[in-house]
Amino acid sequence: MRNAGYQVFKQVFTLAKSISPLEFKEKTEEKRGLTLANYSSYLVNINRLLFWKILPGGEEYLSREEIKHLPVEKKGELFRGWIEENCKDLTFLNLSKAGLTYLPPEICQLSQLQELDLRENQLTALPTEIGQLSELQYLYLNQNQLTALPAEIGRLSQLEWLDLNQNQLTSLPAEIGWLPQLQWFYLNQNQLTSLPAEIGQLSKLQVLYLNQNQLTALPTEIGQLSELTRLFLTQNQLTSLPPETGQLSQLQYLFLNQNQLTSLPAEIRQLSNLLQLHLGQNQLTALPTEIGQLSQLQTLDLNQNQLTALPIEIGQLSQLRALELNQNQLTSLPAEIGRLSKLQWLGLSQNQLTALPAEIGQLSQLQWLYLSQNQLTSLPTEIGQLSQLQWLELNQNQLTALPAEIGQLSKLTKLELAENPLKDIAEKIRQRFRL
């Protein structure tokens, strides 16, 4: 840990030499006889200079003869007054990739700031003064090393966009719920194990990203996010969803891939505006019959689960375009699957299907059908009715023959049949697909 701290200081020290070269001439960090006290002081002042250099007119001011000869400490003392005189009306500030390890408290003087970009620095904490930016609407803090947020973050009453992706946050302060205008909240790739109940107070929140954290559960208050349209929870450790999830009446996109879900609550039926539901790589053994009530659903991803059957209610998903069921344990499909009149993509590879229902032929919009690695011994003649089919994968099954009706599929451009014990293929099919 000490070595890591030294490396950070060494990097900042190097930056300081470029900003205040005369002071550092013929000196090294060893010769300065650093103590913890002057280490901290230098760190603060060096970050002030890095900050100052980026402010409008800052670099020009620091280049003046009477200024550049001053010690770092003296420049630091001038910083507050200079900001007050030159930057109090600033509304936008880009400090991304500035090499900052510390955000100077003078940030609070930029009282008119509406957008602050601090992405790709090395910040481990924020000053409490951040809460004084009462006009701030957009705050970018992604790709830093933040381990916590100050409670004062809750004072940013105008904040609409908060990006904290790729930090090291393990928790959020309760005050996060005090952001009445927040609409977009990004928390991907942190180390969050839970969310505060107060997150439910974000009444205007529309988008919430929580991918790649360590969440094991969601608070019941999540259901209070009445304006939420997108919820991303991929790569967490969720074992269940609270029934209150069903109260997210405006939700359109729900991503839950790569969790440990074993079931879904019946309340999922209440998500009447849901367009996409992603549940791949979980441990689902069955779907609730209520899933059929998702009347607007267009994409349903259930890849890599442990499903052995589908409820007949699956046929009620009248708007479904894509159904992903690869790598499950399905032995059959319900006849009702034929009612999915808008389905374009059907993935069924790596299951245990021995037959397809005749109703498969009713999928008049189907373009892609994946059936590799099953135990199919035959195909229904109705497969020839799939007039829009372009791609048909049947590798690694037990097919000994193909129905001649496959020759009727005028739009079919790809037919894969490898590793089947085929004995009889109609000449028309053989010639067309060069089998």
Briefly describe each language-model feature range.
Residues 110-111:
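Short, solvent-exposed loop/edge-beta patches enriched in aromatic
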